Amino acid sequence: MTVITIAKRGLPKLTTSTSSTTTASSSSTITSVASSSSSLPLLSNSTSSSIIPSITPPSRNGNPYILDSGDMPNGTVFIXVGGIAGVIFLAILLWWVITTYSSHRLTRSVQDYESKMFSTQHTQFYGDSPYMDYPAKENFQDQVHISESDISPGNKDESVKDALVSHTNNEKPFLSNFERPLSSLVSESNRNSLFISPTGDILYKTRLSKLYQESPRLLQKPVIMTSDNVSTNSLVSTISSSSASSLDNGNEKEVGEDIRKPAKIASSPSRKLLNSPESDGSVNRNHSKGNLLVVQSKRKPTPSTYLEHMLEGKEQDE
């Protein structure tokens, strides 16, 4: 057995162990002498050997070309890359949540603003609104729209009185239809609302000024109704008494105006009430057909007056 050792020459240590077997060959020659004088073949035997080295990785001790990573755990690079990717993903997720929440709040605030802007809370004539003191359906009765030919002259006053006075079934004091337009725009039910309609404010001030100028005595006695439909200091009695005194003095036109004023307030622009028989003749002369609630001016209205009448829902004759 032969051991081969390789000397170190600037390379890592390499240890190799080999084993070889050397077999000596021998040849034998048998010579026989025979009478035939023939020769036999030559027999030979030979063997061969090879060296196989074992490879071992070099040691980092004393080798400056190998990084000493003994203080770092295994897979440090993968941990660092995964951490950076996770932080980026969490940042994107947080940004998406914040933008979605902000967009939802903005959309909801815009919807609330638009619902308040286009709602009917500042008018007394269109639909039922939670901002109104009482539902709009309580302002009218079913038997208001009746033709003039179906009722007698005595019942015309009753129809006007029914339109002026409404009642409730819960035995609770309430404002009459005549006093309702005089109430404040910001009532107990909508005092928390910061939105005030300019159109409603104009209508309110216009109605208030006209009522105080044209019929101040009708504002002295409010109507307080109970469930039995009995009124104390009735507004209708006030109108009747003032109408009777006016008839005695020969002022038929003033009677018609006094009766028409509350009827106009109690009715909506789309609901027209029948007037008293005393003023039918003068109304038909001064108004267009089917319009009994608006007094035609003696002269052509100015643009500002026309705008006020248009805001109040009046129909002017050309």
From Swiss-Prot:
The chain crosses the membrane at residues 78-98. The keyword Transmembrane applies. Residues 238-318 are annotated as: Disordered. It is a single-pass membrane protein. Residues 238-247 have a biased composition (Low complexity). GO terms for cellular component: cellular bud neck; fungal-type vacuole; membrane. Belongs to the PRM5 family. This is Pheromone-regulated membrane protein 5. It comes from Saccharomyces cerevisiae (strain FostersO) (Baker's yeast).
